[in-house]
Amino acid sequence: MSGLFITLEGPEGAGKSTNRDYLAARLREHGLDVVLTREPGGTPLAEKVRELLLTPSDEGMAADTELLLVFAARAQHLAQVIRPALARGAVVLCDRFTDATYAYQGGGRGLSVERIAVLEQFVQGDLRPDLTLVFDLPVEVGLARAAARGRLDRFEQEGQAFFEAVRQAYLQRAQGAPQRYSLLDAAQSLEAVQRDIDALLPGILERCRG
């Protein structure tokens, strides 16, 4: 059995964490070793970087600083969690990965795709997710869900135009490589989204055991 790297992507309020946990439970029913993690974060050091990235500050943060912090946390996460788990044959379910960088720092902040790609290759080498689930929903729906959770983090405080750009970046990436991406309608009820995940389960299990 080989390791499998699955990432879950989408804007604020898309339900990635909830559905990551649901998918993990379904995979564990089949006896699979599943590792749950997230970005930014996933290790003690990377979680400290996450706090820097998400905490609002009077000083502000340059877009390039944000980008470099994201990849610094990712390098630690890969070395300490993701690569070792894949090497032992586990299924890694990660709440956000490099697609989020292309969406938020590329789409939202307007940084060049080429610059992100250079850092991606430097930090990850040839490692890319085997499957990416993109949870898509209208921006206003996602922001309303995020606001209902309580205090907004630094990204959640951005305006609608920022998140429209994030959404479009996700959709462009999903449409550009349909063999890797599965696009799910996250505006549906949770039960409907999870039925869509169940429909993907046989293919995921086949890849795990292939």
UniProtKB/Swiss-Prot annotation:
Gene Ontology terms: cellular component: cytosol
GO molecular function, one term: ATP binding
InterPro entries listed in its UniProt record: P-loop_NTPase, Thymidylate_kin-like_dom, Thymidylate_kinase
Entry annotated with the keyword ATP-binding: yes
SUPFAM superfamilies for the chain: P-loop containing nucleoside triphosphate hydrolases
Binding site for ATP: G10, P11, E12, G13, A14, G15, K16, S17
TM region(s), chain numbering: none
Reactions the enzyme catalyzes: dTMP + ATP = dTDP + ADP
Enzyme class: transferase
Annotated family: Belongs to the thymidylate kinase family.
PANTHER family per UniProt: THYMIDYLATE KINASE (PTHR10344), UMP-CMP KINASE 2, MITOCHONDRIAL (PTHR10344:SF4)
Task performed by this protein: Phosphorylation of dTMP to form dTDP in both de novo and salvage pathways of dTTP synthesis.
Record protein name field: Thymidylate kinase
Gene name of this polypeptide: tmk
